[in-house]
């Protein structure tokens, strides 16, 4: 902290520092020490929810709590305040004749934002509010800056994202959303563990970006003098573990993609990838539905959920539609018919579908049609399956129609929530697709991947038929907490 910082102190900050010094002069550490609580606000409210004022008086139960001072009122020899802990707020009632003059001075001089420990008797006020009638106050930590004026919630969005700690202090809805996020992740783990999956950890630093179509962040390893990338997916390492015989694995972790930011994209985000030996994409559809419904039930109950005013029937079986059928239903264009790339591009031109210069196959055009016409119609949970080989370099070809793959994506409210497929375990085919990706990269596709020869070698040792899945955790949390921007579910979103 610089000298300039102290020169800019306002009156409130100066007064708080003076109070800090006064505490030290009294032999009280302004920043406290270990303090043992017997309960938090939530436990007390639950335990005494049905107890009247008279019943509590007769019980004369005591409790020791601690938390941040959020409100304070009163004068003379009596004061009321609210202490906030992780579970919420609880009122304290402080009388000078109960705590003593010295102890009452600690309470009286405490500022909003300070941390206090309170011992006392559980009571209910005449207004019916559960409270602690203090018998002793302990100063635990001095806040040298005042809380934002409107401590019931910050209104400056920039401050909310840059100073999340202030948002958590002042906005209970935001605080609870992040508690819900944690619960969702815990429940996903619980579900997969119950299905016999093993949670593993794989490298964040990769020699070659792979497992997804995305632009990576590039860094340099000084000791080895080599360029490396932050992972854009965990897929290829997890499938190496399937080769190694682990059979059922998953990883929840951060993924990094050097791309644009919008309401549903952040450069670093959390995903889960799951791989199951001896399964295909149909099995993984069932698994995906189970994971998402289990997470939804754990935080929203077992009925439909409401997202931005729309009822989402997340509790019912998810719809399953082939990509070509979905396109045909909306546009009338039938990509089941054999056609040349030229014929496909002519259809795209007729329907005003934008095409990229690296598109070289009919499959690219089919995917462009889907993105242009179908995605925006997928409100209820829908599995779209049968993606073209051209846009699915790691998925196994469909044995009945090798133009398409045994792959699916889950869409809800027009957004993709999961991507999965029967994994490609033919090393010769895999190398060929990597080479096609490398060619697309040369033609200007920044998201195309290079060739991971080590992964191809791993496949040559044999990988059993396998189904794999990736789910974006952040988007799922957005859905289940009814928010519209990813920044509201990331504790510390990327900012300029």
Swiss-Prot record:
Enzyme Commission code(s) on record: 6.1.1.6
Catalytic activity: tRNA(Lys) + L-lysine + ATP = L-lysyl-tRNA(Lys) + AMP + diphosphate
PROSITE patterns recorded: AA_TRNA_LIGASE_II
Cofactor requirement: Mg(2+)
Keyword Protein biosynthesis part of the UniProt annotation: yes
Cofactor note: Binds 3 Mg(2+) ions per subunit.
Example GO molecular function: tRNA binding
GO biological process, one term: lysyl-tRNA aminoacylation
GO cellular component, one term: cytosol
Amino-acid positions noted as binding Mg(2+) 2 in the UniProt annotation, renumbered to this chain: 416
Record's subcellular location: Cytoplasm
Residues bound to Mg(2+) 1: 409, 416
Record key words, sorted: Aminoacyl-tRNA synthetase, ATP-binding, Cytoplasm, Ligase, Magnesium, Metal-binding, Nucleotide-binding, Protein biosynthesis
Alphabetized PANTHER family for the sequence: LYSINE--TRNA LIGASE, CHLOROPLASTIC_MITOCHONDRIAL, LYSYL-TRNA SYNTHETASE
Subunit: Homodimer.
Family, similarity comment: Belongs to the class-II aminoacyl-tRNA synthetase family.
NCBIfam families given in the database record: lysS_bact (TIGR00499), PRK00484.1 (NF001756)
Protein name: Lysine--tRNA ligase
Lineage of producing organism: Bacteria, Bacillati, Bacillota, Bacilli, Lactobacillales
């Amino acid at each position: 902290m610089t000298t300039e910082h102290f020169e800019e102190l306002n009156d409130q900050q100066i007064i708080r520092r003076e109070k800090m010094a006064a505490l030290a002069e009294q032999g009280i550490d302004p920043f406290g020490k270990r303090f043992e609580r017997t309960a938090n606000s939530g436990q007390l409210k639950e335990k005494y929810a049905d107890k009247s004022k008279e019943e509590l008086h007769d019980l004369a139960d005591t409790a020791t709590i601690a938390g941040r001072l959020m409100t304070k009122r009163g004068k003379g020899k009596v004061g009321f305040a609210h202490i906030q802990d992780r579970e919420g707020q609880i009122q304290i009632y402080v009388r000078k004749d109960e705590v003593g003059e010295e102890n009452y001075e600690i309470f009286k001089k405490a500022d909003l934002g300070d941390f206090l420990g309170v011992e006392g008797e559980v009571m209910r006020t005449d207004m019916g509010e559960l409270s602690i009638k203090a018998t002793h106050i302990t100063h635990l930590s001095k806040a040298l800056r005042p809380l934002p004026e409107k401590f019931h919630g910050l209104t400056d969005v920039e401050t909310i994202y840059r100073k999340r700690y202030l948002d958590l202090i002042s906005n209970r809805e935001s605080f609870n959303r992040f508690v819900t996020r944690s619960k969702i992740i815990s429940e996903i783990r619980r579900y997969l563990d119950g299905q016999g999956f093993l949670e593993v950890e794989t490298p964040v630093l990769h020699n070659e970006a792979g497992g997804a179509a995305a632009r990576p962040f590039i860094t340099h390893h000084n000791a080895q003098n080599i360029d490396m990338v932050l992972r854009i997916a965990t897929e290829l390492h997890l499938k190496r573990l399937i080769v190694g015989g682990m059979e059922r694995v998953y990883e929840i972790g951060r993924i990094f993609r050097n791309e644009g930011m919008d309401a549903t994209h952040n450069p670093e985000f959390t995903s889960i990838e799951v791989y199951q030996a001896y399964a295909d994409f149909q099995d993984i559809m069932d698994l995906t539905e189970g994971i998402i419904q289990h997470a939804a039930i754990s935080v929203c109950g077992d009925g439909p959920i409401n997202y931005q005013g729309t009822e989402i029937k997340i509790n019912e079986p998810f719809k399953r539609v082939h990509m070509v059928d979905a396109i045909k239903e909306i546009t009338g264009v039938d990509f089941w018919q054999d056609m040349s790339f030229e014929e496909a591009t002519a259809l795209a031109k007729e329907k005003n579908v934008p095409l990229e210069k690296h598109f070289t196959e009919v499959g690219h055009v089919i995917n462009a049609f889907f993105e242009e016409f179908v995605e925006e119609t997928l409100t209820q949970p829908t599995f779209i399956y049968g993606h073209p080989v051209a846009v699915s370099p790691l998925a196994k070809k469909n044995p009945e129609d090798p133009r398409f793959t045994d792959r699916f994506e889950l869409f809800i409210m027009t957004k993709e929530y999961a991507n999965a497929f029967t994994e490609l375990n033919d090393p010769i085919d895999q190398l060929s697709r990597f080479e096609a990706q490398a060619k697309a990269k040369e033609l200007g596709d920044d998201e195309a991947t290079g060739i991971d020869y080590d992964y191809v070698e791993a496949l040559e040792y044999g990988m059993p038929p396998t189904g794999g899945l990736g789910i974006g955790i952040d988007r799922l949390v957005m859905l289940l907490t009814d928010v519209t921007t990813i920044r509201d579910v990331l504790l510390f979103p990327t900012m300029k």
